[in-house]
Amino acid sequence: MGGNGIRALVGVIASLGLIVFLLVGILANSAPSVPSSENVKTLRFSGKDVNLFHVSKRKVPNGPDPIHNRKAETSRRPPRV
């Protein structure tokens, strides 16, 4: 085997190693996990809303916006529309 044969062999070994590494990672992540009793107790008796479809709305303060109205205060021209 010349230089090309060794390079091809190293490439095949590296590719197989990568495939094995990915398969081990997939199998480790798909293994069923058993929740600990502490996590179940905390979830059950936390008193919070555990609804997965609950959407919290962002609270926007009422009143003038000082960040975006900085230039309007210093200049005496009306804002462009």
Curated annotation (Swiss-Prot):
- Does Glycoprotein count among this protein's keywords? yes
Q: Which UniProt keywords apply?
A: Developmental protein, Differentiation, Glycoprotein, Hydroxylation, Secreted, Signal
Residue intervals passing through the bilayer:
none
Bias (Basic and acidic residues) ranges: 67-81
Give the record's GO CC terms.
apoplast
Q: Name one GO molecular function term.
A: receptor serine/threonine kinase binding
Which sites carry carbohydrate?
64
Residues bearing PTM Hydroxyproline:
61, 64
The signal sequence is 1-30
Residue span of region Disordered: 57-81
Q: Name one GO biological process term.
A: maintenance of root meristem identity
Respond yes or no to whether keyword Thylakoid is given for this record: no
State the family named in the UniProt similarity comment for this chain.
Belongs to the CLV3/ESR signal peptide family.
Q: What is this protein called?
A: CLAVATA3/ESR (CLE)-related protein 25
Question: Which organism is this protein's natural source?
Answer: Arabidopsis thaliana
The major lineage groups are: Eukaryota, Viridiplantae, Streptophyta, Embryophyta, Tracheophyta
